[in-house]
Amino acid sequence: MPDITDKITQEYDASQIQVLEGLEAVRKRPGMYIGSTSSSGLHHLVYEIVDNSIDEALAGYCSHIELTIEPGDIICVSDNGRGIPVDIQPQTGKSALEVVFTVLHAGGKFGGGGYKVSGGLHGVGASVVNALSEWLEVNVHKNGKIYQMKFSRGDITQPMTVVGETDHTGTTVRFKPDPVMFEDTVYDYETLHVRMREQAFLNAGLRITITDQRGEEPVSESMCYEGGIREFVDFINKNKTALHPEAIYMAGERSDSMCEIALQYNDGYNEVIVSFANNIHTPEGGMHETGFKAALTRALNNYGKKSGILKEGDSISGEDSREGLTAVISVKLTNPQFEGQTKAKLGNSEMRTLVDSVVFDRLSQFLEENPAVGRMIIEKALTASRAREAARRARENIRRKNGLEGFNMPDKLRDCNDRDPSLTELYIVEGDSAGGSATQGRDSRFQAILPLWGKMLNVEKARADKVYGNDKLTPVITALGAGLGDEFDINKLRYHKVIIMADADVDGSHIRTLLLTFFFRFMRPLIDGGYVYSAIPPLYKLNRGKTSRIAFSDEERDRISAEMRGDNPNAKIDINRFKGLGEMDPHELWETTMNPETRTLKQITLEDAVHADEVFTVLMGEKVEPRKAFIEQNAKYAVNIDI
């Protein structure tokens, strides 16, 4: 971290808070400002306030941020930065503190005087959080005094008042989300913990402490990583076997931009690249990732040829160069341009040039100085290249077997009549008997059925050639029609709902996990785009006379049972547990699990790719000890276990 004491005296006052527009319509249209009023929007409130503190850290004025979840799901964020300005803001005649919390797009980022780079736009988040809180109070330690303001749903309830004296600087914000605005106001500790850990990795030397005071015993963790993103790579790779002991670290800057990259290869087959711009995760990549990938491939080919490891005519493709790679890319720039539907892609072309230059120069130097590591990486890439060629041959064999042009559809696929992918859905069903019931019960206009049978491949332990050669997965690849790995093209997807329908038992859960591992590793855009669903079949059928009802859980079974008894507590209710989808007749399967009007589908989403990678590695990978530890820690959360 930069030296903070030298910088505290630098001016950060009201003249650096620019007002762009009034705070309007936030409560009418909260989704425009925080994405949604669901759990993700609720947690976004915390990120907005923490981002303001991190801006202080980025500028070199803050070394410790404390986040506390108090009883009643009250949030408190405290930092030891300079403190939000309290003097009069020239444009409005109001205190800067009031402007920051009551005017949208009031912040110290816009003019360039307050912050060189910024993640949250300082002040934008504060006013939105204020508008969506039942109440909010802010205490600023500055100029030897403690200044306090209080608000309710965006309105001032206590003007700025001096409430004491202080010998330090900083800002503390406490707020309670407004239950009128949110579907739920209960915070998930783990969601906040993961985000805070990520920010601690990205800001080397910054200490972030998170505390949950809601339980009988407070839970607290203080995180500070002097190694920054190098330690982030170590964390991601902790359950994998690294090919070289330490992550390779590179950094460089140009004008008002800088980048840092850490990477390490492991003996697995999957690439994990996590990128950020101004501490904001960019899951769709962008120019910084493009520059990184191009430079990595060029540097490896260049060194391979110079060292004689690559023979004449040999070359390593981009995909091969990234097999088993874990990399974290972090860039900081003054005017980030975010693109894509979710603003999750960096569009600044100058970052491609900067990252490309830094990675090529630093990685080339590293390979020259560490020839043993260089040889290991290039030989792994060559092995990947041979496997990719074998996969290509396997693909060609399938094509030849099924006709000259493209894939014919799998024999077991019962396709639908409609050809518009946006209207169609593919049910991937466990077993032939369930597939038969599903085929008879479906609406053939828009529902296709693909039964799977036998033991499926665990792709966590397999390369692409093994995947293409697997007779259980080939039908899935063919039916979806969008390819695999780097060749996957979401525009060729034949169904926009891919629904896994498996029994509600251990075997069904295993099949779901194997399929999700496959989609995550080889068809990631399926999950990122929200195309994958899990059907929720009922667990029980309850009968009383001619009346039948179904239940999806033990609690629902008990409630329905009581309802069916009505005024006669001794009435006989026959309760049958469904052992499998194949036991249901076609009409039952349609009504309970396939009818869009009555079914329950769970969309598979990916909020934290690093955590998902860790879970798949632990559960499906080679190492036994991490899997055993995971099961011991999480057994209490398990459901649907047959004994």
Per-range role (PLM):
Residues 1-13, 23, 45-47, 55-57, ...:
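GHKL-family ATPase ATP-binding module
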Residues 84-107:
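Short conserved segment of the HATPase_c
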